[in-house]
């Protein structure tokens, strides 16, 4: 008889805990569901670190022949701290080439430019003009994707870099974008820090050319202390 009384008690106890566990499972499921839809924190973009560039401009007989020679010379460039960064061809003269390499050290890059063998290699690759070298440090860079390989490089001298930069920022990237120019890069010459190089992606060619030659922009540049005629390089990125 006693065993018969104990059995219902055990059954009731089992049922109670079963119900309790079921409720906890629902609560856990709800909690898990809530946790699953919580958005993950956005990844922070790494802080920008300035870097140095070696700009080379020259004309070639045949681009493909020259490029093969350029690539074959890669190990020598690396020995002098130079690594390929960008390669462009002029819009009007596709055999006018703009080579931009990242560089570790200015002195080494200048030694590379003065190598007697370099002149021989360039001639063999079909370079038919005296190469022009420039060295700069990039202080701003935007490498976010853009749907164009068209670029314009603007080079000019300024009286005071900080005054110029303040005016550039006051003009604003939105204004430039509305005129077909997307900010990509600002660099300062390592030979003369008041020599400035600005690179834009060209999103609307007609608007960009109109803006760059406009009296409004000319006034902005004059007021900002630009004291040399700007040099413009319109080109297509190849790499």
Q: For each of these PLM feature ranges, what is it?
A:
Residues 1-2:
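N-terminal secretory signal peptides that target proteins for export/translocation
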């Amino acid at each position: 008889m006693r065993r018969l009384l104990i059995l219902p008690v055990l059954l009731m106890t089992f049922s109670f805990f079963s119900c309790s566990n079921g409720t906890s499972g629902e609560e856990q499921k709800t909690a898990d569901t809530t946790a699953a839809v919580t958005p993950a924190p956005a990844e922070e973009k790494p802080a920008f670190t300035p870097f140095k560039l070696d700009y080379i401009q020259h004309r070639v007989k045949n681009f493909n022949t020259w490029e093969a020679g350029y690539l074959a010379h890669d190990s020598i460039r690396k020995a002098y701290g130079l690594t390929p960064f960008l390669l462009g061809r002029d819009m009007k003269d596709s055999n006018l080439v703009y080579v931009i390499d990242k560089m570790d050290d200015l002195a080494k890059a200048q030694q590379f430019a003065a190598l007697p063998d370099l002149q021989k290699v360039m001639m063999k690759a079909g370079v038919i003009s005296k190469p022009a070298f420039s060295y700069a440090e990039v202080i701003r860079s935007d490498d976010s994707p853009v749907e164009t390989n068209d670029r314009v490089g603007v080079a000019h001298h300024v009286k005071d870099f900080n005054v110029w930069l303040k005016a550039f920022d006051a003009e604003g990237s939105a204004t430039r974008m509305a005129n077909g120019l997307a900010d990509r890069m600002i660099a300062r010459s390592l030979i003369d820090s008041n020599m400035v190089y600005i690179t834009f992606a060209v999103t609307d060619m007609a608007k960009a050319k109109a803006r760059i030659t406009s009296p409004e922009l000319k006034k902005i540049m004059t007021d900002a202390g630009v004291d040399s005629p700007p040099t413009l390089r319109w080109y297509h990125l190849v790499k």
